[in-house]
Amino acid sequence: RDSSTSRGLGDVYKRQMFFTQKGKCYWLKVYEIPEGTKNSKGRAIQNLLNIDSDDAVNAYLRVKNLNDQDFINSHYVLFCTKNGVIKKTLLEQYSRPRQNGVNAITIREDDRVIEVRMTNGDNEIIIANRNGRAIRFHESAVRVMGRTATGVRGMTLDEDGQDEVVGMICIKDPETETIMVVSEQGYGKRSDIEDYRKTNRGGKGVKTMNITDKTGKLVTIKSVTDENDLMIINKSGITIRLK
């Protein structure tokens, strides 16, 4: 069954970079994406990009200008996979769009891309797993790698055979940003970034939410501020907006 995995605002003059679960990158200009209404079904992304039938888009980034050499050589694309692997590559490596896409990261057979973020080289990273734990570390702990590299261990998962990463966030302003997590049954929790002690990458992290049968497993982690409105969308497409 199809469901929404991410959402965001788009500037028609910007370029969207789409990343698939198998680790490929594709490009579209925002104005090339058909505009719809609140209740319309939308267009299948496979009809707009040359994506393999057994692959799917799991993340995207918006970039205004891939020709700005200063920008693309001072920003990075940060990948996180289901199994806790993290990879950091210079944005410049993805600045030459190709119709059939390019390999953005080498993914092992039992893994998939679940989150992609753009960083400035000085962000803090928080990764969360299904079992309600989160790890915080500085992105300098992740060395820059080539476009097709596999990556390094970002978080160690529980050995219960069911644990996996559900999200990764990049913190740009620890003074104003807070952490929001949401569980399968719609329970949410907001907490200060300082509740998550800084550690080295690759650890198991600290508890971010108490997981019970009532709450269900964790499904997402986001950074939010007091000025943000929150929109939570379930698998049926029902949207709830919160202040």
Language model: regions and residue ranges:
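Single conserved hydrophobic/aromatic residue that forms the stacking wall/gate
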Residues: 2-13
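Conserved structured catalytic cores and adjacent interaction surfaces
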Residues: 4, 57, 61-209, 213-242
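Conserved glycine-bearing catalytic or ligand-binding loops at nucleotide- and phosphate-handling centers
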Residues: 14-56, 86, 90-93, 138-153, ...
